[in-house]
Swiss-Prot record:
One of its GO terms (cellular component) is cytoplasm. GO terms for molecular function: manganese ion binding; metalloaminopeptidase activity. PANTHER family: LEUCINE AMINOPEPTIDASE-RELATED, PEPTIDASE B. GO terms for biological process: proteolysis. It catalyses: Release of an N-terminal amino acid, Xaa, from a peptide or arylamide. Xaa is preferably Glu or Asp but may be other amino acids, including Leu, Met, His, Cys and Gln. Its EC number is 3.4.11.23. This is Peptidase B. Homohexamer.
Length: 427
């Protein structure tokens, strides 16, 4: 490994020879980042991306001004899927160093898991990785159950079984219980539900290549809520939380589900399948039914659910939906505290009725007459939340993954959302 490039911070502008827009300058001592007080964390992250682009793979964050948030901003921009990078961190106090180390361990796990090829990460592997991560930080405070394949059908998890049955890799439901109280009768404070589609071809409503080539990342919601629970535990979460991951491949085969199929759920709802590429809501429904049965104060589901959310927000914000204004406000406050981007999109009672079917209570996709795709998807999910008007948040994870690099991020997963959900759980 070459000698480390020193990276220092300055509140003074760069020498005029670097140009009036210069955010960093280079001299014999290393690289100086010139902070302007307007968006220092963003500036550090963008500069780190440029430094990585120069091929510099070993750096030392040196001098005054570095704290955990600034170190983390640098790492978010510096990390990329290919190659090895080494950072020598500055001296931080014990609390800040522990916070940074936990982010590096858990959010890097989220990014690396989302970036993993689908060939390496099937439904069972995703569930087991989640168990391993949370067990590592929680120890014997965790119990879990994994249900897969035909056992899902026999136990009534018809959405998950239907979507996953077309793959040779069995669909899996992970039900994990983090209970720090030691009391088996302790109330459940929150339930987290994640969409874990480890590859999404679209099924018989097949995707074009340009829309399928990033679908190893369609389990981003599951990775995000797993990371959020693990991170909340490192921050001292002392309440009981349950995690439900709905994991499957959505593939084409002689046994795959088809348009016109009708799924009957355990809560009695019948759903007509009119788009096999709207599979995420079908698997989440099973997880939300289980979550509702726990009678928690709060249910949070996370899913890379719709292209409509990305159309509205790009990859820059996660989309938030809720009927509960107070709870939505709490999550947005958590996002602000953690410097993570969330934006609330509309969800109203009428969205719940914009999925009409001639053969069932619900259609799994909106018609051309109801084009608000992200809102109608949230409306669909609300039918599987017992008390949907209070205590439920739906996150459409549009900021989870980038197909191409931008000035702040490499291509691939971002890890955004983990800290916000953890903040809300521990508030």
């Amino acid at each position: 490994m070459t000698e480390a490039m020193k990276i220092t911070l300055s509140t003074q502008p760069a020498d005029a020879r670097w140009g009036e827009k210069a955010t960093y300058s280079i001299n014999n001592d290393g690289i100086t980042l010139h902070l302007n007080g307007a968006d220092d964390l963003g500036l550090i992250q963008r500069a780190a991306r440029k430094i990585d682009g120069l091929g510099i793979k070993h750096v030392q964050l040196s001098g005054e001004g570095w704290d955990a948030d600034r170190c983390w901003a640098f790492w978010q921009g510096y990390k990329a899927p290919k190659g090895t990078r080494k950072v020598e961190w500055p001296d931080l106090d014990d609390a800040q160093r522990q916070e940074l180390d936990n982010r590096l361990m858990i959010i890097d796990w989220v990014r690396d898991t989302i970036n993993a090829p689908a060939e390496e990460l099937g439904p069972s592997q995703l569930a087991q990785r989640a168990v391993d991560l949370i067990s590592n930080v929680a120890g014997d405070r965790v119990t879990y159950r994994i249900t897969k394949g035909e056992d899902l059908r026999e136990q009534g998890y018809m959405g998950l079984h239907t979507v996953g049955r077309g793959s040779e890799r069995s669909p899996v439901l992970l039900a994990l219980d983090y209970n720090p109280t030691g009391d088996k009768e302790a109330p459940v404070y929150a339930c987290l539900v994640g969409k874990g589609i480890t590859f999404d071809s679209g099924g018989y409503s097949i995707k074009q290549t340009a829309f399928m080539d990033s679908m190893k990342s369609d389990m981003g919601g599951a990775a995000t809520v797993t990371g959020a629970l693990a991170f909340a535990i490192t921050r001292g979460l002392n309440k009981r939380v349950k995690l439900f991951l709905c994991c499957a491949d959505n593939l084409i085969s002689g046994n795959a589900f088809k348009l016109g199929d009708i799924i009957t759920y355990r809560n009695g709802k019948k759903v007509e399948v009119m788009n096999t590429d709207a599979e995420g809501r079908l698997v989440l429904a099973d997880g939300l039914i289980d979550a509702s049965a726990q009678k928690p104060e709060m249910i949070i589901d996370a899913a890379t659910l719709t292209g409509a959310a990305k159309t509205a927000l790009g990859n820059d914000y996660h989309a938030l939906f809720s009927f509960d204004d107070a709870l939505a406000g709490r999550l947005l406050a958590s996002a602000s505290q953690e410097n993570e981007p969330f934006w609330r999109l509309p969800l109203a009672e009428f969205h719940r009725s914009q999925l009409p079917s001639n053969f069932a209570e619900l259609n799994n996709t909106g018609s051309a007459a109801y084009p608000a795709g992200a809102s109608t998807a949230a409306g669909f999910l609300s039918h599987f939340v017992e008390n949907y008007q209070q205590g439920w948040l739906h996150i459409d994870c549009s900021a989870t993954y980038r197909k191409a690099p931008v000035e702040q991020w490499s291509a691939g997963a971002t890890g955004l959302g983990v800290r916000t959900i953890a903040n809300l759980l521990t508030a």
